[in-house]
Swiss-Prot record:
Catalytic residues of the enzyme: S53 (charge relay system), H92 (charge relay system), D142 (charge relay system)
UniProt enzyme class: hydrolase
Protein name: Signal peptidase complex catalytic subunit SEC11
Membrane topology: Single-pass type II membrane protein
Side Lumenal, residues: 34-200
A GO biological process held by the record: signal peptide processing
GO cellular component, one term: signal peptidase complex
PANTHER family: SIGNAL PEPTIDASE COMPLEX CATALYTIC SUBUNIT SEC11
Family affiliation: Belongs to the peptidase S26B family.
Length: 200
């Protein structure tokens, strides 16, 4: 292996060219991801299902494609959301939705609770579109998963996107890398060696 690398180590210019080529591949992938994020209006336009809470609709390891340009989330729609203070996307179905032009369907009790809530950055307003979610394979709704003191999700603040398509099982690679950090180092090492060995 070192014998194969010897020509590159003895030729700094060629080695630098290979490193730049590797950096170009990474930057192209990054720009593609950012472009997709802008188009879908989602910070994470592609996510992986991490649990079995949405079976049988989605299995662990399925790769989901998201769209976040709709102002509302309808009952029955599958959304991905982030819990405040956590960085783990959750894929669940909307079972209740109200607010932001729902025709005044809120209960008086809910309106009173909203009137008592403070307003400010990161907090839902009484006019925001709010939803309640639940995993298809779960018995209870997601209230216990939300941030402390949060009864519902805010469509604008908490939702990453709505599911518009998926590819089964492809995301298992991501799960394996997340559960085994050493595999990331090995994978990057292999990619680096492959680029170094690539001849123009």
């Amino acid at each position: 292996m070192f014998a194969e690398l010897a020509p590159y180590l003895s030729n700094p210019r060629q080695t630098l060219a290979q490193i730049l080529n590797f950096a170009l591949v990474l930057s192209t992938a990054f720009m593609g991801w950012k472009a997709l994020s802008v188009y879908t209006n989602s910070p994470s336009p592609i996510v992986v299902v991490l649990s079995g809470s949405m079976e049988p609709a989605f299995q662990r390891g399925d790769l989901l494609f998201l769209w976040n340009n709709s102002p509302r989330a309808e009952v029955g729609e599958i959304v991905v959301y982030n819990v405040q203070g956590k960085d783990i996307p959750i894929v669940h179905r909307v079972i209740k939705a109200f607010g932001a032009g729902d025709g005044g369907n809120k209960s008086q009790r809910r309106l009173e609770r909203e009137a008592d809530k403070p307003s400010g950055p990161g907090l839902s307003s009484p006019l925001s579109h709010q939803i309640l979610t639940k995993g298809d394979n779960n018995i209870a709704d997601d209230t216990e998963l939300y941030a402390q003191g949060q009864d519902y999700l805010d469509r604008k603040l908490d939702i990453v996107g709505s599911v518009r398509g998926y590819i089964p099982a492809v995301g298992y690679v991501t799960i394996m890398l997340a559960e085994n950090p050493w595999m990331k180092t090995v994978l990057l090492g292999i990619m680096g060696v492959m680029v170094m060995l690539q001849r123009e």
